């Protein structure tokens, strides 16, 4: 089990670098934390980006690695939006949320060519 966690950590690090390049990020967030599923029960979300602290929190518990990475991509898009001076607006259907959703999906489609084995894992 520890080996799989280590592999997933390596993939997450690789993915952050991939997304940073694709989005042409000026910097990385101050921290990216992976937490258990209790966070999603408490906050009703699988990920957050705090624009004040520049921190990302991603729920990893009981989720496929590709789903975790898609959430990470979504939050990294919010980081990019902050770099561009776009207003934070977490409302469902807002322009920045729709952009983050669409771009995260696009990034996952591109990353499948880098790590196709992600889609054969359980």
Locate the predicted segments by residue.
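Post-HExxH zinc-binding segment in Zn-dependent metallohydrolases
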Residues: 90-122
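N-terminal low-structure segments adjacent to metalloprotease catalytic domains
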Residues: 1-7, 80
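Hydrophobic (often cysteine-bearing) scaffold residues that line and stabilize catalytic clefts
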Residues: 8, 12, 69, 96
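Auxiliary, metal-adjacent structural segments of Zn-dependent hydrolase domains
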Residues: 5-60, 112, 117
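Short pre-active-site segment immediately N-terminal to the catalytic Zn-binding motif
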Residues: 55-72, 90-92
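Active-site recognition of the HExxH zinc-binding catalytic motif
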Residues: 70-83
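Substrate-binding clefts and substrate-entry loops adjacent to catalytic sites
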Residues: 82-91
């Amino acid at each position: 089990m520890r080996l799989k966690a280590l592999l997933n950590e390596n993939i997450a690090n690789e993915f952050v670098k991939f997304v940073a390049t694709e989005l042409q990020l000026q910097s990385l967030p101050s921290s990216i934390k992976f937490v258990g599923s209790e966070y999603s029960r408490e906050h009703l979300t699988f990920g957050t980006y705090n624009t004040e602290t520049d921190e990302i929190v991603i729920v990893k518990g009981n989720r496929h690695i590709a789903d975790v990475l898609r959430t990470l991509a979504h939050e990294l898009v919010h980081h990019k939006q902050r770099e561009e001076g776009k207003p934070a607006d977490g409302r469902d259907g807002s322009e920045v949320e729709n952009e983050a959703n669409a771009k995260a999906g696009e990034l996952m489609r591109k990353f499948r060519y880098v790590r196709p084995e992600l889609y054969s894992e359980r």
